[in-house]
Amino acid sequence: MAKALGDSSLLSPFSETISGKRRAACSPRSFATGDIVARRSTQKTTTTVDSRETKKFEQDAELWWRERDGPFGPLHSMNPTRCSFIKDECLEHFKRKKDDRKGSKPLSGLRIVDVGCGGGLLSESLSRLGADVVGLDAGKENVEAAKRRQKESQLEDDEEDKCGTKVKYICDTAEDLGEKEPNSFDVVCALEVIEHVTDPRVFASALRKLVKDDGLVFVSTISKSLRGVLGAIVFAERLAKMVPAGTHDANKFLHPSELAIVLERAGLKTNSMAGMEYNLITKQWKLTNDLGINYIASASVGTFDEKLPSAQVDVNDKRYQD
């Protein structure tokens, strides 16, 4: 059940579980991780925005486009890898031909919302691929930074650089936009966002409300594992100082199987997952089968069914271990 994505060989998140001898059918109610998720969401909320988390990013809003020495440098280096995953998943899902020619617009005609867009890193890249993009962020300073970037791009001579000027940036929440424009987007992206919200289940439901019934949802985050904590907090924040101290809260990390259950309960069926691995020498990221630290997932609309592959969780799967 492996499938190729670009030059990387990727596995559906539960492919070993389905085809191997160690398969164990566990519903969210009987799986311990699902119980943890359930306990997190004990009261209804109208928004999952954590004002403390939003302020963290707003205080550095002026630095969103400092690629090499700024606090968002890791996101800049990660961006091509994230875009590669999104592009290839979209081509397969929407049955489009792959076109790697420079200047091609493989995502042309698709309406995409980038939830938690920050300064517009992903929004701009998706726009260059031809998509009609809405950049959404709850932080006013982040949205203003993205709009300033747009104005600067208008002065560029390179037409490809001007693509970023076509993005529509909005200061709002996923929950509110879902009420205003339900089922309006072919693709919904929430990359490196779910680990900063107050309630992942409510947030996932908001993503479901935004996407069309035949659309795709992309979520990337950090695994709730020892390696996830060591990589994202101990190394990236404290030792290498790649990102500011306090950027992440380990209690908000989500195990890959936990994320699948969160999405499932929101009506989204996980299609595939891929790990994202950072090379300290080349300072570049690549897609891998290792979901132990950073990972990205794609999901489509689907009603929960115990027979679905994403309901078949093997708690002994080595990819879910520390």
Where on the chain are the PLM-derived regions?
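N-terminal mitochondrial targeting presequence
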Residues: M1-T45
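N-terminal, positively charged/glycine-rich alpha-helical extensions of SAM-dependent methyltransferases
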Residues: P28-F72
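Conserved alpha-helix/loop element of class I SAM-dependent methyltransferases that forms part
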Residues: H76-S108
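Conserved SAM-binding loop
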Residues: K98-V229, L259, A297-A299
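Short, flexible, mixed-charge acidic loops at enzyme active sites
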Residues: V229-R238
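Acceptor-substrate binding/catalytic loop of class I
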Residues: A240-E258
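Conserved S-adenosyl-L-methionine
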Residues: L268-L280
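Core SAM-dependent methyltransferase catalytic element
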Residues: Q284-Y320
